[in-house]
């Protein structure tokens, strides 16, 4: 689950997650993707760069 907003500045970042993930999985440079998506602040960029999907890891413990 990607956070809806940046923890630091509050900008909406969840709208960029799907395209970022698809393009990164295709092997494109993350810097270029984030630039194309208009994420200029480093706080917003780190929200996508450092995100790890953990929902599937936690499901067995419910």
Curated annotation (Swiss-Prot):
Its cofactor is Zn(2+). Its main location: cytoplasm. It is found in: Cytoplasm. Keywords: Cytoplasm, DNA-directed RNA polymerase, Metal-binding, Nucleotidyltransferase, Transcription, Transferase, Zinc. GO terms for cellular component: cytoplasm; DNA-directed RNA polymerase complex. Zn(2+) binds at residues 6, 9, 43-44. It catalyses: RNA(n) + a ribonucleoside 5'-triphosphate = RNA(n+1) + diphosphate. GO terms for molecular function: DNA binding; DNA-directed RNA polymerase activity; zinc ion binding. Its EC number is 2.7.7.6. It is an enzyme of class 2 (transferase). Transmembrane segments: none annotated. Binds 1 zinc ion. GO terms for biological process: DNA-templated transcription. DNA-dependent RNA polymerase (RNAP) catalyzes the transcription of DNA into RNA using the four ribonucleoside triphosphates as substrates. Part of the RNA polymerase complex. Belongs to the archaeal Rpo10/eukaryotic RPB10 RNA polymerase subunit family. PANTHER family: DNA-DIRECTED RNA POLYMERASES I, II, AND III SUBUNIT RPABC5 (PTHR23431:SF3), DNA-DIRECTED RNA POLYMERASES I, II, AND III SUBUNIT RPABC5 FAMILY MEMBER (PTHR23431). This is DNA-directed RNA polymerase subunit Rpo10. It comes from Methanoculleus marisnigri (strain ATCC 35101 / DSM 1498 / JR1).
């Amino acid at each position: 689950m990607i956070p809806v907003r940046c923890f630091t500045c509050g900008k909406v970042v969840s709208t960029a997650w799907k395209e970022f993930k698809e393009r990164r999985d295709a092997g494109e440079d993350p810097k270029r993707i984030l630039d194309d998506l208009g994420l200029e602040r480093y706080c917003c960029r780190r929200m996508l760069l450092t995100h790890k999907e953990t929902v599937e890891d936690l499901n067995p413990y419910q």
